[in-house]
Amino acid sequence: MSSKLLTIQLLEELVHAAELNQEGKTADYIPELANVNQELTAIAVQPLGEKTLAYSNNPLHPVTLQSTGKMIPLIGLLEEFGADQLFEWVKVEPSGDDFASITRLEQFGPKPSNPMLNAGAIALCSRIPGVGEQQFRWLEHWVQKLFNQRLSINPLVFASEKRTGNRNRALAYLLKSRSNLGADVHETLDLYFALCSYEAMLDQMLYLPAVLANKGQDPDTGEQILSIETCKITLAIMATCGLYDETGTHMVKTGMPAKSGVSGYTIAVVPGKAGIVVLSPRVNAKGNSIRGEIMLEGLSKAMNWHFALP
């Protein structure tokens, strides 16, 4: 099976094909997320050893990380504490439930099923070392390391998250009642809401998937940013849990480990070949970008990037 050349023209074709799908809508349970252009559709690819290519159908603006930010405490804590300790706090099993499921935690707790669920990310945020401002500085350090630059927190989204995040509060209190929250509920949730409220441009989202694709090395300088062990574990979790109860469908269609967010960002990795980010705020009931999945599937087929292909 021959593959196409990776060109701007190919990316443009993928965007225009995705635009034909009018399903989904912006996430409205976090009110500020509804205030975006729902027709925005974009893709960027960083092939290892080559220049970045990107195409968007509308002017770009910063978009919040939402659940793509769950990669930050996962990777940071893996690097600092190691896998054995991290797996004392969360499991790494696909859940088959939605990203904010309380039932799953009640039935199969006290450990959350995996770090990509809200409960898992909240549990990991409670294990960030330090107290108060020290924990926020830890978060800023790892944001800068994983994005190769500083990012800002969108204050309106942060306030919106805090105002409407009652389900996440329920998860945090349930974790606390099961002795699996390592810090104060309110302080932990402030960290979690801040994590989701960092915002980035499309090109800024590319650094992390490119590093993961490159065995933890900076794609430009070759500097070892993350250990190979952390990359291996992170990619395995993305491949099995990155799109919640739609991960299996995603992997069958694309063969790319990925992590989605309800803001419309999805980052994806082709190990040894490329880092990818797609953006479209039209999400489905599972919290995944519909047009984003269309673009990733089209790119995988065009480039023969499915992991199961020789």
UniProtKB/Swiss-Prot annotation:
Query: What is an annotated GO biological process for this record, any one?
Result: glutamine catabolic process
Query: What's one GO MF term for it?
Result: glutaminase activity
Q: Which residues form a coiled coil?
A: none
List the source organism: Legionella pneumophila (strain Paris)
PANTHER family the UniProt entry points to:
GLUTAMINASE
| Annotated substrate binding sites | 67, 118, 161, 168, 192, 244, 262
Q: Which gene encodes it?
A: glsA
The keyword Hydrolase appears for this protein: yes
Disulphide bond pairs: none
Describe the protein's quaternary organization and the partners it interacts with: Homotetramer.
> Which key words are in the record?
Hydrolase
Q: HAMAP family under this entry?
A: Glutaminase
A Pfam match: Glutaminase
Q: Which SUPFAM superfamilies match?
A: beta-lactamase/transpeptidase-like
Would you identify the family this protein belongs to, as annotated? Belongs to the glutaminase family.
Which Enzyme Commission number(s) are listed?
A: 3.5.1.2
Q: Which reaction is catalysed here? A: L-glutamine + H2O = L-glutamate + NH4(+)
**Protein's name in the database:** Glutaminase
Primary enzyme class = hydrolase
Q: Which InterPro entries does the record associate with it?
A: Beta-lactam/transpept-like, Glutaminase
**Domain of life, per lineage:** Bacteria
